[in-house]
């Protein structure tokens, strides 16, 4: 809306904090969207072999080469996110190297964790009512069916963004 500042950033380093950089300090609403690591690897292996023509071995070499950065720069960002959406498959993903298919949203659950739910006025009873088959796993976390992730994002983020933009 006119007279407001809204910047949307999507990428790996939106909340990165190092000795030289502190991106997190500049962000008003930090949202993490991350699959569990085996699902992340399955997605990468599938994409890089089927769409980019790499061999399984080349993709695994890339994953292993990037592991230090993943552990030291990517993962630590999630401790400062306000809301995390983590997709968790409910099918066997124990060996991502041999997985033939990427689990579908309907073969997944999404764990949504709020760092400080009171700060954003999260209405858990409303979310539980609106998102069929959802439940609370902790006082600040709700679990929703994978196919309802878009609905959950809309129900959670729309009121937060309206409030932030002064509407």
Regions found by a protein language model. Give the residues of each.
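Phosphate-binding/switch loop-helix module in NTP-utilizing enzymes
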Residues: 1-18
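Short His-Asn-centered micro-motif
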Residues: 9-12, 33-34, 87
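Inter-motif core of Ras-like GTPase G domains
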Residues: 22-34
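C-terminal accessory "lid"/substrate-recognition subdomains
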Residues: 2, 6, 23, 37-167
């Amino acid at each position: 809306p006119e007279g407001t500042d809204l910047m949307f950033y999507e990428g790996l380093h939106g909340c990165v904090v190092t000795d030289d950089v502190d991106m997190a300090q500049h962000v008003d609403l930090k949202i993490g969207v991350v699959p569990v690591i085996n699902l992340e690897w399955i997605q990468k292996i599938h994409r890089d072999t089927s769409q980019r023509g790499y061999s399984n071995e080349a993709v695994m070499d890339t994953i292993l080469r990037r592991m230090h950065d993943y552990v030291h720069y990517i993962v630590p960002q999630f401790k400062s996110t306000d809301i995390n959406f983590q997709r968790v498959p409910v099918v066997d993903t124990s060996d991502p190297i041999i997985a033939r298919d990427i689990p579908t949203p309907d073969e997944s659950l999404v764990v949504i964790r709020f760092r400080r739910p009171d700060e954003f006025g999260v209405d858990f009873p409303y979310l539980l009512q609106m998102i069929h088959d959802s439940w609370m796993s902790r006082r600040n976390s709700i679990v929703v069916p994978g196919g309802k992730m878009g609905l959950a994002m809309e129900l959670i983020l729309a009121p937060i963004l309206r409030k932030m933009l002064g509407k």
